[in-house]
Amino acid sequence: SKQTIKIQIKMKQNFKLFAALAASAAMMFSCQQAEDPTMDKAQEPIVKTRAYGDKTPKVTIYVETNDVNPLNAGDYMLSDGTAYADIVEFFAANLNKETVNGVVRPTLYLNDKMTNLLENGGAATYVAGLQAKGIKVVLTILPNWQNIDFTSLNDTQADQLATILAYAVNKYGLDGIGFDNEYGGTVTSVSGSYGNLITKLRAKLPAGKLITLFQYNTGGSSQINATAGAKLDYVYSDFAYYNTSISVAGVTKEHYAPMSINLGNYYSAYQISQYGSYAYDLTEAGYGAIMHFNLRRTSERNQLSLFNSIADGAWEETVTCENGNRPQDWTFVPSGYTITYAEATAQ
């Protein structure tokens, strides 16, 4: 029966997990230190890139660019030769504001660490470098304590912000925009603002670009009606093993991640095993995504056992790490960089 098969698979997952844990104890630092045996050309593995639509559930990895090089997210590879991550979110650019002739306009602010990941040719390294492995790169937008957020935009401001975000996607060769509605400060809600912004952004983006949303504490999702929610590609649950409660109207399970993991935490062997079991469950149930937040360098956390447990549960694959310990090797810009509506609409 299917239940018997499921039990057998879970037993196999646990066996593989404990074997992997024993192996990883001996190999903990191999990701950044060990050298592969020398191969001749005939023996060298072929690097493959999987078409984005071929794997489900998708894996999204958020990278805190304030202290981690996003290229580390592309170093984790499945046993079929393709990337473990399907989407990498650069976390985060900020929703700021300016006043023009007495009228408040939204702006997009790249902080000192984010600026040269995208500006001054940075996108050719940090965005295109991930895309070359078949990974979609999304820029997450986060309010910034300026008393403005995605729930407080009038129609004009929503249109201006959507224009700025679509411009940024084009300027930097990004694959989409992600929303996380936290840290807005004191705001006055405008009915339907969040959904209006999503609708306007979808209309301005080329076909195939992504819009994602992290439903942290639901974050204003009550403002998103079913029509707007259906325009989202992926919604990620608040941190959970397996949270099937979708708080955004119009979002189906194929576009939802019930599993969302903070990689900044330490996890026991039992917890790692549980994540593998839930990865199996959500795959069988037809959910569309798994989310990882706050990827760390391998010198800080050994995430390989966790990724292996999830990959085994979801696709019966294993994961290896090519490096994972890349430093912040770009120059910081103290003033950051601001994209205004004027720049986004300049001819």
Label every model-predicted segment.
Residues S1-K41:
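Bacterial Sec-dependent N-terminal signal peptides
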